[in-house]
């Protein structure tokens, strides 16, 4: 175990799985962290935030003051061992050959970091990431996404902030108000060839799904995962 702070109360945790050469998962999946409490096991799912890389993987999570497992993880020290359950989940890139739009808020960025760092260097179809946070310091992994966009023309990074500083010159407001910006490179007759992936809190996910359906997206084109 190792970790670093990404933003206030948000940490990036790095883990090494002993005894295996490759930790097998599909980008976008989650693992469950196990905390022993009074002889019982408390499980909490967390999306893997890293691409496939040997026997290592990463998590990105915020500290919930009353959260048992997040507090447990935030109290760990480098080198401590953690029990996990194997990767699961279907929030993965369904059609790598199709154009994709990713929409995330907060730590909902975790599965998208895993997908982007894994897929963008290897694939040509355009991918746009619309990432919404409250303030500029909450733009988790910002430097990585900006570097990725600079290196690969097929990737666009659109951060938006609801409480911007006066110096901020990018998009402002919620992601719900910038769906058309994310779809800007798609002609109306190309909508049927675009998949949209959404990850974040329930209210945002539900709002974005409604907006997408009103623009002609079908249920199969909208892949989502809700965080509590």
PLM region descriptions:
Residues 84-96:
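A short, basic/flexible loop-to-alpha-helix module at the beginning of a structural domain
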Residues 109-120:
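Histidine-anchored nucleotide/phosphate-binding helix
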Residues 126, 130-228:
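Reductase modules of NAD(P)H-dependent flavoproteins
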Residues 1-78, 134, 160-163:
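Ferredoxin-reductase
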Residues 28, 108, 201:
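Short, conserved phosphate/pyrophosphate- and ester-handling motifs at nucleotide-, phospho-/glycolipid
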Residues 45-55, 94-106, 215:
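Short, compositionally biased
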Residues 120-126:
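Phosphate-handling active-site elements
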């Amino acid at each position: 175990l190792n970790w670093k702070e990404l933003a206030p109360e948000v940490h990036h945790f790095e883990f090494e799985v002993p005894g295996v050469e490759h930790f097998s998962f599909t980008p976008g999946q989650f693992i469950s962290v196990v905390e022993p409490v009074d002889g019982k096991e408390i499980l909490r799912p967390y999306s893997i935030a890293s691409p496939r890389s040997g026997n290592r993987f990463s998590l990105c999570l915020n500290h919930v003051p009353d959260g048992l497992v997040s507090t447990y993880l935030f109290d760990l020290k480098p080198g401590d061992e953690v029990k996990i359950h194997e990767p699961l989940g279907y929030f993965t890139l369904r059609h790598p050959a199709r154009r994709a739009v990713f929409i995330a808020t907060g730590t909902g960025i975790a599965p998208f970091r895993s997908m982007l760092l894994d897929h963008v260097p290897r694939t040509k179809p355009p991918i746009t990431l619309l990432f919404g946070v409250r303030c500029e310091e909450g733009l988790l992994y910002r430097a990585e996404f900006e570097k990725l966009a600079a290196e690969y023309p097929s990737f666009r990074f659109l951060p938006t902030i609801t409480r911007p500083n006066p110096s901020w010159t990018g998009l402002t407001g919620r992601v719900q108000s910038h769906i058309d910006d994310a779809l800007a490179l798609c002609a109306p007759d190309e909508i049927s060839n675009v998949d949209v992936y959404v990850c974040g809190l329930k209210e945002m996910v539900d709002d974005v799904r409604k907006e997408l359906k009103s623009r002609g997206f079908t249920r199969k084109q909208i892949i989502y995962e809700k965080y509590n």
